Amino acid sequence: MDSEHWISSLAAAKRFYAAQLGHVDDMAGIGMEEVEMEMEDDGEGMELELEMQLEEATWPDVACPYCYEDHDIASLCAHLEEDHPYEPHTSPCPICFEKITRDMLNHITMQHGYLFKSGRRMRRFDIPESQALSLLSRDLRDAQLQALLGGGHRQRRSNTTATNISADPLLSSFGLGFSTLDSEERSKAPVPIPDDTSIHKDTPAQPWESRIDSSLTSEEREQKRKQATDRATFVQGLVLSTLFED
């Protein structure tokens, strides 16, 4: 059953490749006799070679319909996404030759998606750095627009972000670091010094002050209060200047 499956897959791949080049009649049946002879000679080596032939036949190089550069199916999709996202003029599809007006990449992925699954495993291709940056900038622009337009969804997004942070230990460590910095900044903030009049109002009079005040005249008491006020003002200014310089 496996050998019949590989034989039929190889035949279908070769027919597709021949149809692309316009030589269906010349290429019909080519490779079938070779596969059968290899199956009779040896099993394991035949399977490896058959897989390589199938992969080569399944992924033929096709030309870009806009700049005519040769690519396989995977790299062609990456090339169209990066260099030809929206083309104004009509161009034929390099696979089915149907005339496509704008989005060639969407047509290939929707109409010819079977090409990515025809082999035993799908080929992986690296996304170019410029394409990755363009996708990232597009996501950032979308997030910015949602932040500007979606006023009613801000609370929901903040709740979702808080849930994601609590679920991710790395993000939660960042959150703890920010909270620690916030608490340190609060501790370094200058402490407001109360007014001198409020100090006099809140602080009860000491007994020795009452004895001194009783032994002084009214003018001397007024002079001592003035001196104490000047000293308090000077100390207050000195403390504030020291805090602001730090």
Swiss-Prot record:
The record lists its disulfide bonds as none
- On the tree of life, the source organism's domain of life is Eukaryota
Q: Which InterPro entries match?
A: DI19, Di19_C, Di19_Zn-bd
Q: Which Pfam families match?
A: Di19_C, zf-Di19
Q: Which intervals carry biased composition (Basic and acidic residues)?
A: 218-229
Give the start-end ranges of region Disordered.
185-230
Q: Which family is it part of?
A: Belongs to the Di19 family.
Protein name, per record: Protein DEHYDRATION-INDUCED 19 homolog 3
